[in-house]
Amino acid sequence: MRRKIIEWHPNPAAEGWEQTEPDGVVWVDVTKLDAAWQRTEQYVLPGGANGQGSRYERVEQWFEENCYSNMFFAVICDDGIEFGEGRHRFAWLRDRGVEAIQLQVPSDQEHHFIFQFGTELRESVLMA
């Protein structure tokens, strides 16, 4: 097995949103975040069993050839956390034992994410 370090790229602001406060960027513990995500309807089961189409499988194809990804976007909601983008990538990396990821979050939730899900790790290691 080969050790891959994933390089995270921030998502640029969408057209018309350039003047808004930029997203917060945090390092989170995958296990902690997954526990909060399990309580929501959008949770992707291990193996991608309830994922959308072939999105889960396409993540594997991507990481076979690449060592980078756009950051996921998540928000804290009443039920736990929800992804605005990246839930299939998160599930696939979770299932491969990645322990930490870099995530984009609303700036007003940045400290909550750090407090609830933060980690001292600063690398996303994928054994491929």
Mark where each language-model region is.
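Short alpha-helix boundary/capping and kink motifs at helix termini
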Residues: R2, A13, P22-G84, R94-D95
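A short, basic-hydrophobic beta/loop patch
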Residues: Y68-L121
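A polyampholytic, Gly/Pro-enriched intrinsically disordered region
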Residues: R122-A128
